[in-house]
Amino acid sequence: ADLSAGELLTFFRGKKASPLEAAKDVLARIADLNDDVNVFRLIDEVGTLEDAKQSERRWFKGEPLGLVDGIPVSVKDVLLTKGWSTLWGSKLTSPDQPWDEDAPPVARLREYGAVFVGKTNTSEFHWKTVTDSPLTGITRNPWNPELTPGGSCGGAAVAVATGMGPLALGTDGRGSIRVPCSFTGVFGLKPTF
């Protein structure tokens, strides 16, 4: 669970680790730490393990789909993800509306074999630079739980900082990736569309 995406790819290529092992390690880390820092609103253990098994088969055949094949990835809970609800950190949205399509960045990662783990917490409608919401409560900074991890991608940054996955997908209009990354000591990029 402490390996970077690049290290995992090297291990997959060398058959020193498999996508299924990586997924199981990430899920175990989530089970150990999520209650303490409140990162995930949704964890899809069954889907994660199934996607990891499919990725493992591709790697064993020497046919990975791309540079993220088998890499565990979390998704900020504002990005549409096929089969999952997207609640925007709010009680105003219905949890009974799983989407039948992916947002473009989710679709691109899925096309290249990413293993999606779950949805990370965000501030309500990702509108402030702390990660708390009436839906999920407060996400804690992993290095000092009395401090904020920043926002609105605080859940994503804490997931990466604590080894609950090497990659997290977020959004950034006014610092929503950059602020949490600086508060938790991880690297983040403001994406373009």
Please place each PLM-identified region on the residue numbering.
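An N-terminal boundary/leader segment
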Residues: 1-50
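Generic hydrophobic alpha-helical segments
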Residues: 8-12, 55, 156
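Flexible, acidic active-site loops/lids enriched in D/E/S/T/G that coordinate Mg2+ and/or position polar
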Residues: 45-68, 75, 95, 99, ...
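Enzymes and membrane/adaptor proteins characterized by extended Gly/Ser/Thr/Asp/Glu-rich
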Residues: 67-105
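Short glycine/serine-rich loop segments
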Residues: 99-193
